[in-house]
Amino acid sequence: MEQCGVLPEFKGIAMHDCWASYWNYPDIQHAVCCAHLLRELTGIDENHPEQKWASAFIDLLLEMKKVKDKAVEKGKDFLSYYHYHKFDKKYDELIEQARKENPLPETTEKKRGRKKKGKILALVERLANYKVPVCLFIHNFNVPFDNNQAERDLRMIKVKTKVSGCFRTEEGARDYLKIMSYVGTAHKQGYNAYEAIKNAITG
């Protein structure tokens, strides 16, 4: 994460999957990828149908996305007070419901220290602690619902390893990532990949 020097100097909005290491960058405004949350919530809903809050939370996230998409179609860059209040209230209600369904395990005298949480409770606490980053996409319309584009950018790395087997050296892997990052950024900004590489070489 430190290798290319991007995140340490970054001052914008970074969307991620809530991996703990990302929160070590206090100067970044964080946004949580809702596609990752939907996958986790769907897993809980399918494997633990008694967890009624999970399916309700899926519905909430999708409704938030739907309402935002409609607002964007109408040329707006914000939601109505009604919708902000509705989503905020429903979010808190579902967190409360989830906590009631998944209370913290009691500690015993033999086991001291931090209480161990299961995957379900860990997700509940994440949703509670990072409510603002989760909901940022409806407050700032420049923030997407998910970071699927970033994940698509990474698929070429997987294709490369499948075709070539692996990178021979760590330095070679770093060079490959730098080149792909440069080409990907150029493409997003509307530049031809060939011209971008030629300009980088010729200065």
Predicted regions and their residues:
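Catalytic center-proximal scaffold of phosphoryl-transfer enzymes
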Residues: 1-203
